[in-house]
C-alpha cells in the first residue's frame, strides 16, 4: 500500500509520507547544523509524520474525519528513552504546539506529553517498512544542566522541524512555484554599504558634526573586525548611529561568516525610519520589516516579504522587542518558525535601555 502525506488541491498530484519525511529531515538537519545539532533536526524531521502510516489518516485525505497523526512519533520516541524522550516534545507538537510534560496522573484526554503517551491512536506500525528511526547524537555545544537551557534547545530544534515541514508542504502544494526569495549576508551587501558611505569616509573635518559622525563610523567599522562578543554603541542624536551600527554589523558578518543581521527595536516609528535607510542602502528585497504596522497589498498570493515574515529568512530583519521576545518564549509553530534563523546571526538591540 502507498501511504500519502499530501494530495494537491486539484487531486492530480500526490506526495508520499516517505518523500515528505525525507525532505523535512534533510532541511531540518540543514537548519540545525548551524548550531551543531543536525542529528536532532534529521531524526525529528524523519519521524514527525509516522502517524500518517494509518488507514484512518489515508481516509482523512479523502475527506474522512480528523485523525491525530502527531502522537505516534512521540510514542515511539518516548519508548526509546533517553534523549529520544526529549525529542518527543518536538514531534508531538509539530502542529498543536510544544506541549507541557504534565505528570503521570494525566489521563489520555490531557494535551500534555504524559497524557498524549496514554492516548489511543490508529495503528501506524506500517511505518517500519519504510522509515527507520535515526540515531541521535549528543549536542556538541553545551546545553547546560538547567531546565531553561534544555527547553530553549528543544525550541530551536522545534523551529527547524516546523519550518522545514511548512516549507516542504508549501513547495509541494504550489509545485515549487512560491514567491520566496530567501537570502543571507554576502560581500555584495558590504560593497553597497561602502559605496553609500564613501562620501562620509572622505570627510577630513575633525570638529564638525560631520567630522564626528565620520569618526564614529570608522570606529564601528574597525570594531566589526574584532572577535564575536557583546558590544555597546553609545552615540548622541545626529551622530549617525543607524548607518554606523549597520557598518559594524555588515563588517562583522562578512569577517565571521554570520548569516543575517537582526535589529530589535522598541518603537515602530524607529523601526520604520531605520528600515527605510537600510532599504535605501541595501535594496528593497534585502530588508524585512516585521511589525504590526506593516501593510501588504492583498492578492491571490503572498508576496516575498509576507512569506519572509513567517520565518525571517532575509539578510536583514528589523522587528520589535515584542515580536522578538514573544517568539523566543512561544510554544506555537507559527511563532517559533523563525527561531532557527536567529542562530549564527548578529543581534542589535536599539534603545536597549527600554527593555524591561
What are these regions (language model features)?
Residues 1-196:
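Accessory nucleic-acid engagement/destabilization modules that flank
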Residues 17-20, 197-234:
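Conserved pre-motif I regulatory segment
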Residues 225, 310-314, 333-345:
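Short basic/glycine-enriched coil/helix segment immediately N-terminal to the Walker B
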Residues 227-249:
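Walker A/P-loop
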Residues 235, 292, 351:
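The Walker A (P-loop) glycine that initiates the GxxxxGKT/S ATP-binding motif of P-loop NTPases
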Residues 244, 249-250, 257-281, 294:
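Conserved Walker A/P-loop ATP-binding site and its immediately adjacent core
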Residues 282-329:
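Inter-Walker segment of RecA-like/P-loop motor cores
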Residues 321-325, 335-356:
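SF2 helicase catalytic motif II
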Amino acid at each position: 500500500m502507498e501511504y500519502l502525506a499530501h494530495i494537491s488541491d486539484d487531486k492530480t498530484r500526490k506526495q508520499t509520507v516517505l518523500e515528505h519525511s525525507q525532505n523535512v529531515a534533510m532541511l531540518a538537519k540543514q537548519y540545525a547544523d548551524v548550531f551543531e545539532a543536525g542529528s536532532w533536526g534529521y531524526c525529528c524531521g524523519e519521524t514527525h509524520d509516522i502517524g500518517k502510516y494509518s488507514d484512518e489518516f489515508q481516509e482523512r485525505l479523502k475527506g474522512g474525519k480528523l485523525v491525530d497523526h502527531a502522537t505516534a512519533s512521540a510514542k515511539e520516541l518516548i519508548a526509546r528513552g533517553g534523549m529520544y524522550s526529549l525529542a518527543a516534545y518536538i514531534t508531538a507538537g509539530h502542529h498543536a504546539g510544544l506541549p507541557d510534560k504534565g505528570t503521570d496522573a494525566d489521563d489520555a484526554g490531557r494535551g500534555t506529553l504524559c497524557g498524549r503517551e496514554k492516548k489511543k491512536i490508529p495503528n501506524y506500525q506500517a511505518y517500519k517498512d519504510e522509515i527507520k528511526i535515526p540515531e541521535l547524537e549528543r549536542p556538541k555545544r553545551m546545553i547546560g544542566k538547567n531546565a531553561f537551557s534544555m527547553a530553549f534547545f528543544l525550541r530551536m530544534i522545534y523551529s527547524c522541524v516546523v519550518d522545514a515541514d511548512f516549507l516542504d508542504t508549501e513547495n509541494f502544494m504550489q509545485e515549487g512555484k512560491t514567491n520566496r526569495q530567501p537570502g543571507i549576508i554576502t560581500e555584495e551587501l558590504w560593497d553597497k554599504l561602502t559605496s553609500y558611505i564613501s562620501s562620509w569616509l572622505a570627510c577630513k573635518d575633525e570638529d564638525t558634526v560631520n567630522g564626528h559622525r565620520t569618526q564614529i563610523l570608522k570606529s564601528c567599522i574597525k570594531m566589526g573586525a574584532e572577535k564575536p562578543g557583546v558590544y555597546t554603541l553609545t552615540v548622541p542624536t545626529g551622530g549617525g548611529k543607524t548607518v554606523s551600527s549597520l557598518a559594524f554589523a555588515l563588517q562583522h558578518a562578512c569577517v565571521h561568516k554570520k548569516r543575517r543581521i537582526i535589529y530589535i527595536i522598541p518603537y515602530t516609528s524607529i523601526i520604520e525610519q531605520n528600515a527605510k535607510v537600510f532599504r535605501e542602502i541595501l535594496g528593497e528585497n534585502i530588508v524585512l520589516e516585521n511589525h504590526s504596522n506593516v501593510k501588504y497589498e492583498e492578492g491571490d498570493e503572498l508576496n516575498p516579504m509576507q512569506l519572509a515574515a513567517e520565518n525571517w529568512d532575509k539578510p536583514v530583519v528589523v522587528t520589535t522587542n515584542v515580536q522578538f521576545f514573544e517568539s523566543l518564549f512561544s510554544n506555537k509553530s507559527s511563532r517559533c518558525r523563525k527561531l532557527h534563523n536567529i542562530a549564527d546571526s548578529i543581534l542589535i538591540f536599539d534603545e536597549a535601555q527600554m527593555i524591561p
